[in-house]
Amino acid sequence: MSVWGKVLGASAGFALGGPLGALVGAAAGHYIAKFRANALSSEGSDNASFAGENSQEARQVVFATALVVLSAKLAKADGVVSREEVVKFKTIFNIPKSEISSVGAIFDKAKETADGFEPYAEQVAQLFQSTPAVLENLVGALFEIAKSDGWVHEAELRYLRNVSRIFGLDSGTFARISSQYAPEDGEPDPHSVLGVSSDTPDQQLKARYRELVVQHHPDKLIANGMPPEFVQKANEKLALINSSYDKICAQRNIK
């Protein structure tokens, strides 16, 4: 079963708590915000709670659910939900036809207003606080939704910046993400992609590159809770990191 078939939780034996669980329950016509003893989150938290042996799968369900909700909130941020944004959402996230209606119910419920996205962002931020690369990929996916109608509107950019802040990503990381997904003049600047400057010493450049490759390797992201359905996007991001490093090395004649 794809991760999209698990977002409602009950059929897979999951119990999704907190704001995400409440919204999913409302969309499904019932609430499934129950808690289990072996929680992924800290005791007393409102985050999603699953059996310990399902921790990786549980994180994947939370990731996918949060992405549906935050994408819907983003689509409404500029005041209008365009057809391009809805189509782009279905395309980027490879939602099977059999799951479109159930995922669509959550999307529709979440887009009723652009207000109130913070609790959902806070819930997923707490769960993935030790794996910021997963959160970075989530923000990147939101950027793709934002630019699906040709450009990123100012209201959408504010929304993305606020989500990134709640995720605990600093301004430098947000600038690096935005340079990858919303370049002003075509190709992303390789220095911006790596988060370095033109005068960064070669050894620091190499260290930074290696750090990013480790953080954003698809296998590691999946192990940390990114659903396998997103591996193509992860591969594209890793390829961009590699090509950016190669371009800088060519400019500097680094062998």
Question: Model regions: which residues?
Answer:
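Small-residue-enriched hydrophobic alpha-helices in membranes
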Residues: M1-K76, V80-K255
